[in-house]
Amino acid sequence: MYKRQVQHTEPDHSGGFKKVYAKYPNAKVYASISGKKNMIEQYFDQVPYQVVKTNDTINTGKYDFVFVEMQMIHWPDNMLTYCPQLKTVFSNDAFGQHIVNFNLTDEGLDKAYCLKQAKEYFANIVLPYTTPVQAKLNLILGMNLDIEYIMPAHGIIWKDYIADIIETYKGIAAQKVENKAVIVYESVWKHTQQIAENLAEGFSDAGMDVKVYKLSDTKSSIVMREIMDAKVVCIGSGTYNNVMAPSVAAFLEHIRPCKFKNKKGLAFAAYGWFNQVAKEIDTRMQQSGIESCHDVINQCYTPSDDQLEDYFNVAKEIAKKCQE
């Protein structure tokens, strides 16, 4: 009998199931309990499903496949599979990236580039689930698997940099931070931009690595990657019809499920007659786990030289707090 594994039921993973089913209608389908439910909801209920859980093994005649449930990395149905004969981990979404390489593996690719791409993927797909990632990573490492290849569902196959990607995952799953400040903002008349630029100068003067992004000019995936390991996050907006800029509101919604740890935050805004936007930004930053470390900055119209110096010093003060 033919056997099929369904590691994940999101359509980019399972979308070809109908074609496979048409050719092998009697093949048994192995899936997690959530995977079975999702497959029935999306495709067929008459398929011979078999639910598997961690450490269950199937044999295809030539190969054994050991299953590991990977709930909430990043759906409830996710599974990882290990083949001892091939010394290969089929890791599903874990360890994924969006790298295209004709050699299929990481051979010949710059290590820093590969890890950077993996971080960007993690930040935008898996970041809200660092706690289960950490738990499952410890479980898998505790199984002492002999691994020569890690084959994620997205991107290149890990071969040369397996130890490096595992160490990278350990760090980001533990939400380790670097001595870095990330400032994101939206501005039309440059009032908010001036605040951002002077904060950046203050952080830099205090010895921190600084990244500054205007949201309308930057892919949010890049901003997410940089925020992931930042010690300080500053978010600012101009005031538009008594609310924050739509790009800032969307970004705050993007980070809300992340539940960050080990991050200090500062909210800032420019306004003309309604000065509540910075407070709203601060509230939403705290909802994402970013701890407020200074009073919000409210700037009425154009900042003076003295005010810009104040913002420079605010950044230095925050940087100092982060070293204590």
Protein language model features and the residues they cover:
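Metal-dependent catalytic neighborhoods of phosphoester/phosphodiester hydrolases
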Residues: 15-23
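Short, small-residue-biased leader/transition segments that mark boundaries at the very start
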Residues: 1-2
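Short, charged N-terminal beta->alpha structural module
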Residues: 184-205
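Catalytic core of the metallo-beta-lactamase
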Residues: 44-108
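Residue-level marker for buried hydrophobic side chains located in beta-strands
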Residues: 5, 88-90, 151
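Short internal beta-strands
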Residues: 6, 26-34
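Divalent metal-coordination and catalytic microenvironments
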Residues: 8-10, 81, 93, 133, ...
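FMN-binding flavodoxin-like domain, especially the glycine-rich phosphate-binding loop
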Residues: 101-104, 110-150, 154-157, 176, ...
